[in-house]
């Protein structure tokens, strides 16, 4: 193997991560807190590639919940923030704001903090149900927890459905 051999495929970093989800409530009313921490290990590929393919790291924190407003109405929501560094070798940011994350995440000049979320209001009046949905993902929202995700959009949706046969 020669790192200069262009016929060799681009390598991939060994990526590790951990996370948890903890919640409280019932199936009708609940709230969950979740966290994901993932990072690439720079030493897992040949040094030749380090400035061509940067190692990344990410932390995601989110809240997800459901509230049964009344018998036919339910509200569900999911909101998450992602702090994503595209280069773990970039210089660390030294400021009062970033000190709050010391020991949790190294904020670098290659780091971005973005938000994503959705809210759904559903009404179930048998045999008809309806839903109003709003989704938002900020530009450049990224997470190492998903292989692909569209970003930079807002969407509003309305849907209705019914049963034809029992």
Placement of each model-derived feature along the sequence:
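Signature for the C-terminal beta-barrel architecture of outer-membrane proteins
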Residues: 1-166
């Amino acid at each position: 193997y020669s790192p200069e051999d262009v016929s060799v495929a681009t390598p991939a970093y060994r990526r590790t991560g951990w996370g948890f989800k903890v919640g409280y409530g019932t199936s009708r009313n609940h709230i969950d807190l979740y966290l994901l921490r993932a990072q690439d290990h720079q030493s897992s590929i040949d040094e030749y590639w380090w400035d061509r393919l940067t190692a990344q790291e990410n932390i995601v924190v989110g809240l997800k919940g459901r509230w049964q407003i009344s018998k036919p109405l339910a509200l569900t929501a999911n909101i998450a923030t992602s702090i994503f560094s595209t280069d773990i070798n970039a210089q660390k940011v030294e400021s009062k704001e970033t000190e709050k994350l010391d020991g949790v995440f190294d904020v670098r000049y290659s780091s971005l903090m973005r938000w994503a979320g959705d809210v759904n209001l559903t009404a179930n009046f048998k045999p008809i149900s309806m839903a109003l949905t709003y989704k938002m993902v900020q530009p450049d929202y990224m997470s190492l927890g998903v292989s692909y995700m569209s970003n930079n959009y807002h969407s509003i949706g309305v849907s209705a459905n019914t049963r034809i046969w029992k």
